[in-house]
Amino acid sequence: MGKYFGTDGFRGEANVTLTVDHAFKVGRFLGWYYGKNHENGKAKIVIGKDTRRSSYMFEYSLVAGLTASGADAYLLHVTTTPSVSYVARTEDFDCGIMISASHNPFYDNGIKLINAAGEKMKEDVIAEIEKYLDGELGEIPYATRENIGCTVDYTAGRNRYMGYLMSLAIYSFKGIRVGLDASNGSAWTLAKAVFDALGAKTYVINAAPDGTNINANCGSTHIEVLQDLVRREHLDVGFAFDGDADRCLCVDEKGEVITGDHILYIYGCYMKDRDKLVGNKVVTTVMSNFGLYKAFDAVGIEYEKTKVGDKYVYECMSENGYRIGGEQSGHIIFSKYATTGDGIITALKMMEVMLAKKKTLSELAAPLVIYPQVLKNIRVTDKTQAQDDADVKAAVEAVANALGADGRILVRESGTEPVVRVMVEAGSTEECEKYVDQVIDVIKSKGYAV
């Protein structure tokens, strides 16, 4: 993780942490860097954005930087992160840029960089961008006259992505009542258009973005809103997306939440039944619920655990050829169809399993028993020092020994904040609370808490 770019791009409060000057310079660098690969010096870069008020401001700044360095900028306008990835990897683009802070509040924003393969940008390129932002690379020449880049409205790319999504459905959705929570974000028109075209009866909420209501008490981080809709309208299933629609959580016909762990279990079993689960493995992160692994053990599915972050999940999948992986939060990667988490593809695949198995989502998820989990964050002066402290480690080991085979404890640093996260899974919420507080009390007693 660098000074500016974290595990999911350059993210922070608009014009405080991430400024228009930063965006302009990122554009300047990318236009120059990729232009060197072309005889005419002209790179071709595609840009998407979410519905935040500041996304337009950052789009203009990036375009100014790109075209000033001689690159052509292709604008998908409001779209999803996975659509930028799809367009970048299926057309002749040098890279893609998504302007979004994902599930964060409207006043934050971010710049996500995607390479020509549709993957998150490699660390060596990010390192060079950081050097340029810090003034270590000197001046980049400005393009002049006919060498100044062009700006192209490229809604055709977004439409092609929508067609691709529809091509993935192997069953008609006719007669199925589906709830969609668009989080007032990138999926606000796209998700409904896809499900309507496939024949579903859609009930859409939080699809009226105004620049400040993205993720505001809605979407995958406020799943209770969709739960209420599913119960009130007696729907068959519901899907909730986050601000840039790279994640999806589900609600079954009873109004109960289906997490990313449930999705991994349901699709992993579906693939195993069809002898298509490569390596007989599903990729998870260390934050997946203890119950998921017990459920996998019961059906003979093996698993890999990575660090938290869909970037690490994808790297493991890519290196080993695995087909399914993801996070509890709903970042699910179907590597046959995408190189990133894609909330709409996740929803389509859950529909496919329901229709193929002729079962409800609650029936498909039933064998997975989720263990009670308590996760608490503590702000600290130095997250690495706090986590590595000998007394803190001893407290963690004591909890692990007390839990034995009936639970687990995980202590880790946040990738984006000065925070240590303490998580316990056990037989009861009370037991989880007790053990989490034990560790946090030690962190506080050692003077690390802010």
PLM region spans:
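Phosphate-binding and adjacent anionic-ligand microenvironments
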Residues: 237, 274-450
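Short glycine-centered, acidic/aromatic-flanked micro-motifs in structured strand/loop junctions
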Residues: 48-50, 180-182, 252, 336, ...
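General beta-strand structural signal in soluble alpha/beta enzymes
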Residues: 5-6, 47, 73-78, 98-99, ...
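Proline/glycine-rich low-complexity loops and linkers
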Residues: 127-162, 167, 253-326, 332-334
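N-terminal small/polar loop signature for handling phosphorylated ligands or for N-terminal nucleophile
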Residues: 44-108, 193-251
